[in-house]
Swiss-Prot record:
The gene is ths. Belongs to the TCP-1 chaperonin family. This is Thermosome subunit. It comes from Methanopyrus kandleri (strain AV19 / DSM 6324 / JCM 9639 / NBRC 100938). Forms an oligomeric complex of eight-membered rings. InterPro entries: Chaperone_TCP-1, Chaperonin_TCP-1_CS, Cpn60/GroEL/TCP-1, GroEL-like_apical_dom_sf, GROEL-like_equatorial_sf, TCP-1-like_intermed_sf, TCP-1_chaperonin, thermosome_alpha.
Amino acid sequence: MAMLAGDGRQVLILPEGYQRFVGRDAQRMNIMAARVVAETVRTTLGPMGMDKMLVDEMGDVVVTNDGVTILEEMDIEHPAAKMVVEVAKTQEDEVGDGTTTAVVLAGELLHKAEDLLQQDIHPTVIARGYRMAVEKAEEILEEIAEEIDPDDEETLKKIAKTAMTGKGVEKARDYLAELVVKAVKQVAEEEDGEIVIDTDHIKLEKKEGGGLEDTELVKGMVIDKERVHPGMPRRVENAKIALLNCPIEVKETETDAEIRITDPEQLQAFIEEEERMLSEMVDKIAETGANVVFCQKGIDDLAQHYLAKKGILAVRRVKKSDMQKLARATGARIVTNIDDLSEEDLGEAEVVEEKKVAGDKMIFVEGCKDPKAVTILIRGGTEHVVDEAERAIEDAIGVVAAALEDGKVVAGGGAPEVEVARQLRDFADGVEGREQLAVEAFADALEIIPRTLAENSGLDPIDVLVQLRAKHEDGQVTAGIDVYDGDVKDMLEEGVVEPLRVKTQALASATEAAEMILRIDDVIAARELSKEEEEEEEEGGSSEF
């Protein structure tokens, strides 16, 4: 790329082949890329949303209508489009649901911004107006939100069901919602008078076979491993559990030492000493009263034999994350040296049992006292069903946790978006300058959610929006679309509820992404290297700066 100096001479700044888009061209290109991403997932929004089939280079197929999964599976290259994908990832990390809403909203905010840019309104003014609008929108959402009691399990089930609607688990939705609420409440903890939930303490284990109704909540852990020795007990009641982060093996020396053996007796003595050391390790474990051992490292074949003789059930190569969950579930402490193991380090469970699930052996740790880690074992007829059920349950866990932590919910069905849009238009009348147009554009953009819900349900979006606006003008704050019969109803009465955090996070993420993309007025893209140049780069042969 060349630029002219003051005296008219050309100054080379970048190598030949670079592409540069400046001003409106850059903004138009970025907005278009972001809107394409939003349009891709828009048809998946709501209970009647369509699914996407994604096939990768290896021929693996993913069928889903989960926004973040679709965007992660797509190989998106455009930098502005990637920013919108980040919106979905942030929403997923923060709340677990509302990813499609956030992306669709970001796309529509940029669409409205493009109209304002064509009216010669500066991007900074639009961004400032959007910021004013999102702050006011969050205030409005706080005002219209309903408080919930943490013990109100019915409302929590409704929240879980709303998150799972349209995600391939319809026939078992009520049952799965009940499991999710129980699981989340089980791992909830109180800190400084507030409910704190780490959803990582709920393990989701998938196994094909059976139906969705066979999914079960285990108040303990399910480990996808089997006993290390067939002579070990298959079932241990009143289990005393040891968690070891060290191998039950004879350590090899770190130095390259050699032992010279000159007669068979020396070799025999060497083998016997190894056996004695392993026997002592097993005796030490047995002396503490442990009858179940979960080991993060390996267990020597001979040690397996000694453990089996002592009637101890042992599992090896357990994942670190599973060990941590086992500790929370059973009350055990993870020990890094067998010599340090004591009775106080042992955890407890009513039963530890090896069971066959869909032809595979798994270890079930059940009947733990007030476990702070639990497992949901997901079943389903095919791999695609199980995968989609996992995504639905993950979303439900996220929203139930958010509702319990915040204690506030809003209606679904597009109700909060229409109400916020209505109040924002009133607020815009008091805004001076061109920012007023941006606030009004923000209000219009919010209505993309009810409009899309209507379109995806085969309804007329204009008719639905007219009805919704009329109801909200009459003060019916929770009026939303019943996508099943096309009527406008009270969403709280219909049981369509979402945590407040889903909406506030979607608004914040979408607005920030839209602002960031609007502020870009120059895109400089390096040219792609040819295969020959790539080979030169790899060989270190390129000397161009």
